[in-house]
Design a protein with these regions (language model features):
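Bacterial Sec-dependent N-terminal signal peptides
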Residues: 1-27
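Helix-turn-helix repeat elements of alpha-solenoid scaffolds
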Residues: 155-163, 246-254, 288-295
Length: 317
Protein backbone atom coordinates (compact mmCIF):
# COMPACT_ATOMS: atom_id res chain seq x y z
CA UNK A 1 0.00 0.00 0.00
CA UNK A 2 2.85 2.38 0.91
CA UNK A 3 4.50 1.69 -2.45
CA UNK A 4 1.30 2.51 -4.32
CA UNK A 5 0.92 5.74 -2.39
CA UNK A 6 4.52 6.66 -3.14
CA UNK A 7 4.13 6.06 -6.87
CA UNK A 8 0.85 7.96 -6.89
CA UNK A 9 2.45 10.91 -5.14
CA UNK A 10 5.40 10.85 -7.54
CA UNK A 11 3.09 10.77 -10.57
CA UNK A 12 1.11 13.71 -9.19
CA UNK A 13 4.30 15.67 -8.57
CA UNK A 14 5.58 14.99 -12.09
CA UNK A 15 2.24 16.10 -13.54
CA UNK A 16 2.45 19.36 -11.62
CA UNK A 17 6.01 19.92 -12.84
CA UNK A 18 5.12 19.27 -16.48
CA UNK A 19 1.76 21.06 -16.56
CA UNK A 20 0.85 24.33 -14.92
CA UNK A 21 -2.44 26.13 -14.48
CA UNK A 22 -3.62 29.13 -16.45
CA UNK A 23 -6.79 31.16 -16.08
CA UNK A 24 -8.76 33.34 -18.47
CA UNK A 25 -11.40 35.69 -17.06
CA UNK A 26 -13.32 37.56 -19.71
CA UNK A 27 -15.96 40.20 -20.17
CA UNK A 28 -18.42 39.75 -23.05
CA UNK A 29 -21.55 41.78 -22.19
CA UNK A 30 -22.91 41.56 -25.74
CA UNK A 31 -23.18 37.79 -25.43
CA UNK A 32 -24.69 37.34 -21.96
CA UNK A 33 -26.19 33.87 -21.40
CA UNK A 34 -24.58 32.51 -24.58
CA UNK A 35 -22.05 29.69 -24.74
CA UNK A 36 -18.36 30.53 -24.83
CA UNK A 37 -15.87 27.95 -26.07
CA UNK A 38 -12.14 27.33 -25.77
CA UNK A 39 -10.41 25.37 -28.54
CA UNK A 40 -6.91 24.15 -29.29
CA UNK A 41 -5.36 23.59 -32.71
CA UNK A 42 -4.76 19.94 -33.45
CA UNK A 43 -2.34 21.14 -36.10
CA UNK A 44 -1.83 24.43 -37.92
CA UNK A 45 -1.67 23.08 -41.47
CA UNK A 46 -5.17 21.63 -41.44
CA UNK A 47 -6.43 24.34 -39.08
CA UNK A 48 -8.54 21.77 -37.27
CA UNK A 49 -9.67 22.73 -33.78
CA UNK A 50 -10.54 20.48 -30.87
CA UNK A 51 -12.81 21.68 -28.07
CA UNK A 52 -11.15 22.02 -24.68
CA UNK A 53 -13.86 23.66 -22.61
CA UNK A 54 -17.32 25.19 -22.79
CA UNK A 55 -18.93 27.62 -20.38
CA UNK A 56 -21.94 29.92 -20.26
CA UNK A 57 -21.44 33.67 -20.12
CA UNK A 58 -23.20 35.08 -17.06
CA UNK A 59 -25.97 37.65 -17.15
CA UNK A 60 -23.32 40.21 -16.23
CA UNK A 61 -21.30 39.17 -19.28
CA UNK A 62 -18.53 37.37 -17.41
CA UNK A 63 -16.93 34.06 -18.40
CA UNK A 64 -14.01 32.07 -17.03
CA UNK A 65 -11.76 29.24 -18.17
CA UNK A 66 -9.23 27.31 -16.09
CA UNK A 67 -6.82 24.94 -17.76
CA UNK A 68 -3.38 23.39 -17.80
CA UNK A 69 -0.52 23.84 -20.23
CA UNK A 70 3.03 22.54 -20.36
CA UNK A 71 4.26 25.47 -22.43
CA UNK A 72 3.17 28.41 -24.53
CA UNK A 73 0.11 27.43 -26.55
CA UNK A 74 -2.15 29.32 -28.94
CA UNK A 75 -5.82 28.81 -28.13
CA UNK A 76 -9.00 30.01 -29.80
CA UNK A 77 -11.91 31.31 -27.77
CA UNK A 78 -15.29 32.60 -28.82
CA UNK A 79 -18.91 31.85 -29.58
CA UNK A 80 -20.04 29.56 -32.38
CA UNK A 81 -19.87 32.45 -34.85
CA UNK A 82 -17.26 34.87 -33.52
CA UNK A 83 -13.75 33.89 -32.53
CA UNK A 84 -10.52 35.31 -31.23
CA UNK A 85 -7.20 33.84 -30.14
CA UNK A 86 -4.96 34.03 -27.12
CA UNK A 87 -1.57 32.62 -26.20
CA UNK A 88 -1.48 30.98 -22.78
CA UNK A 89 1.55 30.04 -20.76
CA UNK A 90 2.10 28.25 -17.44
CA UNK A 91 0.86 30.28 -14.46
CA UNK A 92 -0.69 32.81 -16.83
CA UNK A 93 -3.62 34.86 -15.58
CA UNK A 94 -5.54 36.73 -18.26
CA UNK A 95 -8.22 39.38 -18.02
CA UNK A 96 -9.73 40.05 -21.43
CA UNK A 97 -12.62 41.81 -23.13
CA UNK A 98 -14.42 40.05 -25.96
CA UNK A 99 -16.41 42.69 -27.83
CA UNK A 100 -17.72 42.68 -31.40
CA UNK A 101 -17.97 45.93 -33.34
CA UNK A 102 -21.11 44.58 -35.02
CA UNK A 103 -22.82 42.44 -32.36
CA UNK A 104 -26.23 42.69 -34.02
CA UNK A 105 -24.95 41.81 -37.47
CA UNK A 106 -26.80 38.70 -38.56
CA UNK A 107 -24.23 37.91 -41.26
CA UNK A 108 -22.37 35.66 -38.90
CA UNK A 109 -21.35 33.49 -41.79
CA UNK A 110 -18.58 36.06 -42.27
CA UNK A 111 -16.93 34.46 -39.23
CA UNK A 112 -15.73 37.77 -37.82
CA UNK A 113 -12.48 37.54 -35.90
CA UNK A 114 -12.46 39.61 -32.74
CA UNK A 115 -9.30 41.17 -31.36
CA UNK A 116 -9.14 40.66 -27.62
CA UNK A 117 -8.42 43.57 -25.32
CA UNK A 118 -6.08 42.61 -22.47
CA UNK A 119 -6.04 44.18 -19.01
CA UNK A 120 -3.15 44.14 -16.51
CA UNK A 121 -1.02 42.00 -18.82
CA UNK A 122 2.32 41.00 -17.30
CA UNK A 123 5.31 42.36 -19.23
CA UNK A 124 6.87 38.88 -19.22
CA UNK A 125 3.79 37.29 -20.75
CA UNK A 126 4.05 36.06 -24.34
CA UNK A 127 1.01 38.11 -25.43
CA UNK A 128 2.63 41.31 -24.14
CA UNK A 129 5.87 40.51 -25.96
CA UNK A 130 4.18 39.60 -29.24
CA UNK A 131 1.85 42.60 -29.31
CA UNK A 132 4.70 44.95 -28.42
CA UNK A 133 7.04 43.48 -31.01
CA UNK A 134 4.43 43.59 -33.76
CA UNK A 135 3.68 47.25 -33.07
CA UNK A 136 7.36 48.15 -32.95
CA UNK A 137 8.22 46.29 -36.16
CA UNK A 138 5.24 47.75 -38.04
CA UNK A 139 6.23 51.27 -36.99
CA UNK A 140 9.87 50.74 -37.92
CA UNK A 141 9.08 49.43 -41.40
CA UNK A 142 6.51 52.17 -41.94
CA UNK A 143 9.06 54.84 -40.99
CA UNK A 144 11.72 53.63 -43.42
CA UNK A 145 9.56 52.29 -46.27
CA UNK A 146 9.79 55.56 -48.23
CA UNK A 147 13.52 54.91 -48.66
CA UNK A 148 12.92 51.58 -50.40
CA UNK A 149 12.24 53.26 -53.74
CA UNK A 150 13.90 56.64 -53.28
CA UNK A 151 17.06 55.64 -51.41
CA UNK A 152 17.48 51.86 -51.79
CA UNK A 153 20.95 51.68 -50.27
CA UNK A 154 19.81 53.56 -47.16
CA UNK A 155 16.77 51.28 -46.85
CA UNK A 156 19.01 48.22 -47.04
CA UNK A 157 21.31 49.70 -44.40
CA UNK A 158 18.38 50.36 -42.06
CA UNK A 159 17.18 46.78 -42.51
CA UNK A 160 20.65 45.64 -41.49
CA UNK A 161 20.50 47.86 -38.40
CA UNK A 162 17.09 46.37 -37.59
CA UNK A 163 18.42 42.83 -37.74
CA UNK A 164 21.42 43.69 -35.56
CA UNK A 165 19.11 45.23 -32.97
CA UNK A 166 16.95 42.11 -33.00
CA UNK A 167 19.98 39.86 -32.55
CA UNK A 168 20.94 41.90 -29.49
CA UNK A 169 17.41 41.68 -28.08
CA UNK A 170 17.32 37.94 -28.74
CA UNK A 171 20.36 37.42 -26.53
CA UNK A 172 18.50 38.99 -23.61
CA UNK A 173 15.33 36.89 -23.89
CA UNK A 174 15.07 33.33 -22.64
CA UNK A 175 11.74 32.38 -24.26
CA UNK A 176 12.44 30.08 -27.20
CA UNK A 177 8.85 30.54 -28.39
CA UNK A 178 9.26 34.32 -28.56
CA UNK A 179 12.65 34.03 -30.26
CA UNK A 180 11.12 31.81 -32.93
CA UNK A 181 8.28 34.30 -33.24
CA UNK A 182 10.77 37.12 -33.83
CA UNK A 183 12.70 35.04 -36.34
CA UNK A 184 9.69 34.12 -38.48
CA UNK A 185 8.19 37.59 -38.18
CA UNK A 186 11.36 38.93 -39.78
CA UNK A 187 11.18 36.17 -42.38
CA UNK A 188 7.61 37.11 -43.30
CA UNK A 189 7.51 40.87 -42.78
CA UNK A 190 11.07 41.93 -43.62
CA UNK A 191 12.84 39.41 -45.83
CA UNK A 192 9.81 39.09 -48.10
CA UNK A 193 10.13 42.78 -49.00
CA UNK A 194 11.68 43.25 -52.43
CA UNK A 195 14.68 45.48 -51.74
CA UNK A 196 18.34 45.80 -52.73
CA UNK A 197 20.24 43.16 -50.80
CA UNK A 198 17.15 41.13 -49.91
CA UNK A 199 17.85 37.41 -49.46
CA UNK A 200 17.23 35.16 -52.44
CA UNK A 201 14.65 32.38 -52.34
CA UNK A 202 17.41 29.84 -51.75
CA UNK A 203 18.84 31.93 -48.92
CA UNK A 204 15.41 32.15 -47.32
CA UNK A 205 14.98 28.41 -47.72
CA UNK A 206 18.34 27.76 -46.05
CA UNK A 207 17.86 30.34 -43.30
CA UNK A 208 14.32 29.50 -42.28
CA UNK A 209 13.34 26.05 -43.55
CA UNK A 210 15.98 23.70 -44.92
CA UNK A 211 18.43 23.99 -42.04
CA UNK A 212 15.92 24.29 -39.22
CA UNK A 213 13.68 21.81 -37.41
CA UNK A 214 10.00 21.92 -38.33
CA UNK A 215 8.15 23.82 -35.60
CA UNK A 216 4.77 22.10 -35.87
CA UNK A 217 3.50 23.76 -32.68
CA UNK A 218 4.47 27.30 -33.68
CA UNK A 219 1.86 29.23 -35.64
CA UNK A 220 4.34 31.73 -37.11
CA UNK A 221 6.62 29.01 -38.44
CA UNK A 222 3.71 27.21 -40.04
CA UNK A 223 2.36 30.45 -41.52
CA UNK A 224 5.76 31.10 -43.09
CA UNK A 225 5.88 27.54 -44.41
CA UNK A 226 2.50 28.03 -46.10
CA UNK A 227 3.57 31.34 -47.63
CA UNK A 228 6.86 29.96 -48.92
CA UNK A 229 5.26 26.91 -50.53
CA UNK A 230 2.04 28.58 -51.63
CA UNK A 231 0.90 27.13 -55.01
CA UNK A 232 4.17 25.22 -55.08
CA UNK A 233 2.89 22.72 -57.63
CA UNK A 234 2.48 25.53 -60.15
CA UNK A 235 5.97 26.93 -59.52
CA UNK A 236 8.05 23.82 -60.11
CA UNK A 237 9.17 22.68 -63.56
CA UNK A 238 6.18 21.65 -65.74
CA UNK A 239 7.72 18.27 -66.51
CA UNK A 240 8.17 17.57 -62.81
CA UNK A 241 4.64 18.75 -62.11
CA UNK A 242 3.20 16.40 -64.73
CA UNK A 243 5.19 13.46 -63.38
CA UNK A 244 3.99 14.27 -59.89
CA UNK A 245 0.40 14.26 -61.14
CA UNK A 246 0.90 10.72 -62.48
CA UNK A 247 2.44 9.58 -59.18
CA UNK A 248 -0.52 10.97 -57.26
CA UNK A 249 -2.95 9.35 -59.69
CA UNK A 250 -1.22 6.01 -59.13
CA UNK A 251 -1.21 6.48 -55.36
CA UNK A 252 2.54 5.88 -55.35
CA UNK A 253 3.94 7.67 -52.29
CA UNK A 254 7.51 6.54 -52.89
CA UNK A 255 7.45 7.93 -56.41
CA UNK A 256 5.89 11.27 -55.45
CA UNK A 257 8.53 11.66 -52.73
CA UNK A 258 11.32 10.79 -55.15
CA UNK A 259 10.04 13.30 -57.70
CA UNK A 260 9.74 16.12 -55.16
CA UNK A 261 13.30 15.45 -53.99
CA UNK A 262 14.52 16.72 -57.38
CA UNK A 263 13.43 20.24 -56.47
CA UNK A 264 16.07 22.24 -54.55
CA UNK A 265 13.47 23.59 -52.12
CA UNK A 266 12.40 20.11 -51.06
CA UNK A 267 15.76 18.60 -50.20
CA UNK A 268 14.95 17.60 -46.61
CA UNK A 269 12.89 14.37 -46.30
CA UNK A 270 10.61 15.40 -43.42
CA UNK A 271 10.03 18.85 -44.88
CA UNK A 272 9.38 17.30 -48.28
CA UNK A 273 6.74 15.03 -46.79
CA UNK A 274 5.01 18.07 -45.28
CA UNK A 275 5.21 19.91 -48.61
CA UNK A 276 3.46 16.98 -50.28
CA UNK A 277 0.61 17.17 -47.77
CA UNK A 278 0.32 20.91 -48.36
CA UNK A 279 0.21 20.38 -52.14
CA UNK A 280 -2.65 17.94 -51.67
CA UNK A 281 -4.48 20.29 -49.32
CA UNK A 282 -4.28 23.18 -51.80
CA UNK A 283 -5.29 20.87 -54.63
CA UNK A 284 -8.67 20.46 -52.93
CA UNK A 285 -9.45 24.02 -54.03
CA UNK A 286 -8.26 23.88 -57.65
CA UNK A 287 -8.50 21.59 -60.65
CA UNK A 288 -4.99 20.17 -60.57
CA UNK A 289 -6.12 16.80 -59.22
CA UNK A 290 -9.43 14.95 -58.99
CA UNK A 291 -10.81 15.01 -55.46
CA UNK A 292 -10.82 11.22 -55.28
CA UNK A 293 -7.08 11.15 -56.05
CA UNK A 294 -6.36 13.77 -53.40
CA UNK A 295 -8.32 11.94 -50.73
CA UNK A 296 -6.73 8.62 -51.64
CA UNK A 297 -3.21 10.04 -51.24
CA UNK A 298 -4.09 11.71 -47.95
CA UNK A 299 -5.52 8.41 -46.72
CA UNK A 300 -2.33 6.61 -47.71
CA UNK A 301 -0.21 9.20 -45.92
CA UNK A 302 -2.41 8.96 -42.81
CA UNK A 303 -1.66 5.23 -42.69
CA UNK A 304 1.86 4.89 -44.06
CA UNK A 305 3.86 8.04 -43.31
CA UNK A 306 6.98 7.44 -41.23
CA UNK A 307 6.27 10.73 -39.45
CA UNK A 308 3.44 10.31 -36.89
CA UNK A 309 2.54 14.00 -36.97
CA UNK A 310 2.11 13.77 -40.75
CA UNK A 311 -0.31 10.90 -40.34
CA UNK A 312 -2.35 13.11 -38.01
CA UNK A 313 -2.25 16.14 -40.32
CA UNK A 314 -3.28 14.10 -43.35
CA UNK A 315 -6.15 12.60 -41.36
CA UNK A 316 -7.27 16.06 -40.20
CA UNK A 317 -7.30 17.46 -43.72
Amino acid sequence: MQTNLTFTGLFTLLSILVYSQFQVIGLAPQFANESMYLWKYEDYLSGRLSLLQETTISEDGVFKFNGQTSGITKLVLGTEELKSYIYVQPKGNYKVEFVSENPQNQSYNLKEEIELTFFDLDSNDINFKILGFQAWLDNYISDIYFDKDFNPSLFSKKIGILKLALMKDAQADTSSYFLDFMNYSVASDVDNINFVGAPSEMEKYSNYLGNNPILYQHDYYMAYFETFYNQYIHRIEPELSNSLFKAFAAGNLNLSDSLLSKDPYASVPELRSLIRIYILKQALNDNFLPRSVILNNLKLISKESIYPIHRTIAQNI
